[in-house]
A protein has these predicted regions:
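Acidic, metal/ion-coordinating pockets
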Residues: 1-139, 144, 186-198, 209, ...
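Solvent-exposed loop/linker segments at secondary-structure transitions
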Residues: 115-254
Length: 254
């Protein structure tokens, strides 16, 4: 069954007053596959907003695209109530006209608590957005935890089928390993040095080891002990180490 192009949910408050909130979803066309049809994000957004706006009290866009594109979207469709965004790994907040844009940190390190207050008499909408850090002070939601445990079990079985034991400790002691995107994309860290050293050990005849920093996806600081799961979530794309002979002139260009 295909996903619906739009979604409307009805909310009811304590006195029985109802509000209909429409949702549209947008994502950037990344890693295009031949079996998927892609449309222009902004054209699609306008189309689905126009379909929803007269049948609900507010329209919210849930997006996964660059902040600049979320800003462009807010300017293109000023009637949107809110854009809940993703893609960047650091928190962002902006208000473009009357459109709020919120993005929390990656890896569930933080979350936005967003409250939409709608006056049904004059249709005035006010929004309050607060960001909280997700840590041990935040109580685990029982219903959410059921889903988390279900998918953790599915993931662990999948890892096991590939020969991994997600809970097995690879490194017991040592300093935390810095895999934060803001650092590994611009400089060396102890984690990137460890990865390069591992490749050099696997390919002892190589003079140079090169790693695409974009393949390191953890965007976090790994605390000891480090498990096989930490390795998987740090380098989830897999692939092989390739040894290539090349001239120094080509290496400089790379």
């Amino acid at each position: 069954t295909p996903f619906p192009e739009t979604y409307i949910r009805t909310f009811t408050d304590a006195d029985g007053t109802t509000a209909r909130i429409g949702f549209i979803g947008l994502t950037l066309p990344f890693n295009k596959a031949a079996f998927v049809t892609y449309t222009d994000v902004f054209t699609a957004a306008q189309k689905y907003y126009d379909q929803l706006k007269d049948s609900c009290d507010a329209v919210v866009a849930i997006t996964h695209q660059a902040m600049d594109d979320d800003i462009k979207l807010a300017r293109q469709i000023p009637g949107l109530a809110l854009i809940i965004g993703g893609h960047e790994h650091e928190r962002h907040y902006a208000k473009i006209g009357n459109v709020y844009i919120t993005k929390a940190d990656a890896n569930a390190k933080s979350a936005y608590i967003i409250k939409l207050n709608l006056n049904k008499k004059d249709h005035a909408l006010t929004i309050k957005a607060d960001i909280i850090d997700v840590n041990e002070k935040v109580a685990i939601d029982a219903a959410t935890d059921v889903v988390v445990q279900k998918w953790t079990g599915i993931a662990n079985k999948s890892y096991a089928s590939l020969g991994f034991d997600a809970t097995k400790v690879c490194m017991q002691n040592g300093e935390p390993l810095d895999g934060r995107e803001a650092y590994i994309r611009t400089q060396q860290t102890n984690f990137t040095r460890l990865i390069v050293s591992s490749i050099e050990k696997a390919s002892p005849a190589a003079d140079v080891a090169i790693v695409n920093s974009g393949s390191i996806r953890v965007d976090d600081i790994l605390q000891m002990p480090v498990t096989q799961y930490d390795v998987i979530r740090s380098l989830p794309f897999g692939g092989s180490i390739m040894e290539v002979d090349m001239k120094g002139s080509l290496l400089i260009k790379i």
